[in-house]
Amino acid sequence: MSQLLEKAKDFVVDKVANIKKPEASVSDVDLKHVSRECVEYGAKVSVSNPYSHSIPICEISYNFRSAGRGIASGTIPDPGSLKASDTTMLDVPVKVPYNILVSLVKDIGADWDIDYELELGLTIDLPIVGNFTIPLSQKGEIKLPTLSDIF
């Protein structure tokens, strides 16, 4: 009897491990909006859904770092669903207050940009498997807004 249960367990584990899962990538991080309080950047995330039905996204969590310091983090609850058998583009807004940017003066230096690392966690609700988080990471540099961008 225990051999039968062990075989059944191995079968289920093998099938669950080989289930197709959505794949995601960060395609771009750009300046989105400048206000008097903060600079808002937008991360464009491309997510492909291999299933023939839409899948709900539970949440998107993000951590925006520069010079080894966290400069913005947050969670976007219930951002929508992934389209069935298609690629969905998600826009993740990241708001960075000016006082944080001022503290990064050494990194900004002469080239007027921020070297960043963006870590995203895209949590989706897969049938049978349950909540599944796709970890994403993107490194790059973003130009800071000039006075002409603000006014």
UniProtKB/Swiss-Prot annotation:
Gene3D superfamilies in the cross-refs: 2.60.40.1820
Stated name of the protein: Late embryogenesis abundant protein Lea14-A
Family of this protein: Belongs to the LEA type 2 family.
Keyword field: Stress response
Induction pattern: By water stress; in leaves.
Listed Pfam families: LEA_2
Species name: Gossypium hirsutum
SUPFAM superfamilies found in the cross-reference section: LEA14-like
One GO BP annotation of this record: response to desiccation
InterPro entries: Lea14-like, LEA_2, WHy-dom
